[in-house]
């Protein structure tokens, strides 16, 4: 067998180098040689015939070749279902003019008992004038004679007793008209051709005539009666209709087959769904394991750093956080040397169920809270605060369920929260998180805040050392605490008598902080946006409140905010060690708390002189809370938990306006100082993304995890994309230029005005229509500013597609500002129930495909080499930038490169300015997958499938490499690229005979089409530099002239379209 395989490989090599015009003759010689030398090896002969069938199946010049038909008949002998094989040949047009195919096919059907179908096959061959005609007609006459011979014995037995099957036939004959009898159903009902009924009628008439002739030859059979029962010969399998004493009808038989087929389809569907679920579970487990390993590493690093820094903790001041606010009624200024607040999540509540949080996100919170807020030896920064009230808006919390009391029947709260940090240069640890509160300093420095049990397991010993708190005589109590709270706090008061100032001091409730005002993205995008979409609130360090017992002076609240609201402004700075199980645990852990209860003297408030270095080297964040009303009567005891949460809230309804106050001078100066710090923004971004939660549904990975290769079948699967969008740390709906509408998408028509919030849009005309969307040119203007008018595009899709908008926003966030113009810019997204409208930048001068077609009408027929090199250099740079953001475009082709007005206006050295990459609907964000993920699916655009897809190999970034190569090929030759595999090397099918710079282009296409694997991608910068060098050497004097000529062609093309 090995010898035969070697011989076959030699034969294949011979056929690849064969240049004759009759390859079938070579196959015929080889098969004859195999039959002579290996007559007993039938399996190999069958394999050889199968290869021959595949080789010549689509070569129409051999479809009626007698040699090829002979091999098809031989191959049919080895086929278990010959009828299906002959049907396949007939549908492919093979042997339609050969009598041997029809004779073999009809003979097989006759052997199976399907006489009616066999007769139809004979008649089909005669109708198609199959050669040789005489042989086919002779075989058909013999078939009819055999059919008559079968009928004659049955005629002599008509007077004998009938069996059950014959009774059934007799009933059918007497109760059915001749028209109904002609519609008898054969065995293979599903595959019967439409001409069978007519052929059946012809057959019966022929049989009737032959019976009359036999009666003249002294046959005793009556000519008037005998032919009729013979014409009713049953043409179906009686065994399937008769089962013992019962009989099936045709409908019941069909129903039985239908049920069997449905069961099979259901089984296949369930098996497919099971495999998808299995793959998804493995995918999630891989992500979870990967992130857990990374978090373990970070926790170990934190522990090592904490142990190293522990001896010097007494000489180190800390950075503390606060959510400061101002009451909208009083509007008084708050000042303090340190703004600190460490909030906790409610561990147990007597009146409502606590919201369970997964363990993994808590670990991420622990890492962030430890890494992002280290201590610093810097002076304190006072932050005076002022604010103004907000109007009718609501803060929706999407991560935890908390209670928000209302201040009136028509009052709603708005929480616009960022992060605030202030620096404390005192040796003692103050507590000013609750407003203008005086407290006694303590010499015990706060230990690192820990939020997970696993982290506590590592650094528990750090909190067990005894402390020596200072003694204070101030023992004011909080007047708003109820009896349960007083009893709880009394434990600390008792400790204060003997060991120092551990009592609860006088605490004032915080009013709402000043709000932040941002007037949209007009500066960034150049498009006026609806200003009724407030930013999503992000509250750092808030904790939920337990249900309070009703009091006579307590404000009523509705059930609407029982579970999904956020309490803003109320802070209680209790930091505990291990996670408490009961109130008693707080008592034992009170002296180990990192921030005990103090008052802080008002005379220690100082303004640092050097404001520029306030946060010079710190990983700090500034947070600003804005709430409309925050007057809450604390009527019942609160249970504290050590878990610190980050709550994000957003307002999806675009119909509610929001206003806000401005920063005070000190706060703005602090923010500017923060911008000047040397923070590694990439590190902070990764850590903030990790802090968003590592749910099972979320598949976002850390940037520096070296995970093994993971295979995903189809990155464009709708369910997978919905899963990725739902697991984002920053949802698409939280962007300030995203608007959700609770109505259906309106029908977009040209020459019509539409109102989108404060944006008035006039649809001018349809620019293009693809398989997934329609693109309109529109003129928009702000309702509040009649002079503002600008052209844009409206991309209308059904159903809603927020994925493209997400990719566009991620590109703008991850790319450098100087390259933003190279990619499509979306001004806003409007999401409806059944569709979406993306408002984006307009490019007026057509796509690269239009440019290629324009040159086809010139004498050159193709684009000049200088322009090809210019555009190719820009394309390689674009793709390089996209890949550096860990994004795959996925649909690079000539009609997705577009020219805008910048191409006509720019006259600098960058001659390709104005070329932009559009259509991000097929893009893939690799940051949402484990590092090293590969894909196996195929894109829908068959002409742009990369070699990895054609050879069923895994791929990721290769799809963009192939897209660039195919686009450049289209510019060079004016046609789409087709590739072929020659000896394992992929090449374009076109000839490169008179192409300038042949060596360079052959090397380029070889590199782009023959990528070793997903982990060894070629350098786009290397290819770009080679082209740039060639362009400067050969075409530096011609390129501007060619570019100006193209500008004229584009301008004329634009005018012709109008």
Swiss-Prot record:
Residues modified as Phosphoserine: 306, 313, 330, 512, 550, 579, 582, 648
Domain notes: The KEN box is required for its ubiquitination and degradation. BUB1 N-terminal domain directs kinetochore localization and binding to BUB3.
A GO cellular component annotation in the UniProt record: kinetochore
Function of the molecule: Serine/threonine-protein kinase that performs 2 crucial functions during mitosis: it is essential for spindle-assembly checkpoint signaling and for correct chromosome alignment. Has a key role in the assembly of checkpoint proteins at the kinetochore, being required for the subsequent localization of CENPF, BUB1B, CENPE and MAD2L1. Required for the kinetochore localization of PLK1. Required for centromeric enrichment of AUKRB in prometaphase. Plays an important role in defining SGO1 localization and thereby affects sister chromatid cohesion. Promotes the centromeric localization of TOP2A.
Active site: 891
Region of interest called Disordered, as start-end residue ranges on this chain: 334-359
PROSITE patterns assigned: BUB1_N, PROTEIN_KINASE_ATP, PROTEIN_KINASE_DOM, PROTEIN_KINASE_ST
UniProt similarity note: Belongs to the protein kinase superfamily. Ser/Thr protein kinase family. BUB1 subfamily.
Keywords of the record: Apoptosis, ATP-binding, Cell cycle, Cell division, Centromere, Chromosome, Chromosome partition, Kinase, Kinetochore, Mitosis, Nucleotide-binding, Nucleus, Phosphoprotein, Serine/threonine-protein kinase, Transferase, Ubl conjugation
Subunit structure: Interacts with BUB3 and KNL1. Interacts (when phosphorylated) with PLK1. The BUB1-BUB3 complex interacts with MAD1L1.
Protein name, UniProt field: Mitotic checkpoint serine/threonine-protein kinase BUB1
Disruption phenotype: Early embryonic lethality.
Lineage: Eukaryota, Metazoa, Chordata, Craniata, Vertebrata
Regulation: Autophosphorylated when the cells enters mitosis.
Motif segment (KEN box 2): 611-613
Source organism of this protein record: Mus musculus (Mouse)
Ranges of residues in domain BUB1 N-terminal: 11-182
Region of interest: Essential for loading of BUBR1, MAD1L1 and MAD2L1 to kinetochores: 446-464
Sequence motif: KEN box 1, positions: 522-524
PTM annotation (Phosphothreonine): residues: 595
Region annotated Necessary for interaction with KNL1, chain positions: 99-132
Gene3D superfamilies: 1.25.40.430, 6.10.130.20, Transferase(Phosphotransferase) domain 1
Annotated tissue distribution: Highly expressed in testis. Weakly expressed in spleen and lung.
SMART domains for the chain: Mad3_BUB1_I, S_TKc
Molecular-function GO terms, alphabetical: ATP binding; histone H2A kinase activity; protein kinase activity; protein serine kinase activity; protein serine/threonine kinase activity
Region Necessary for kinetochore localization: start-end pairs: 1-146
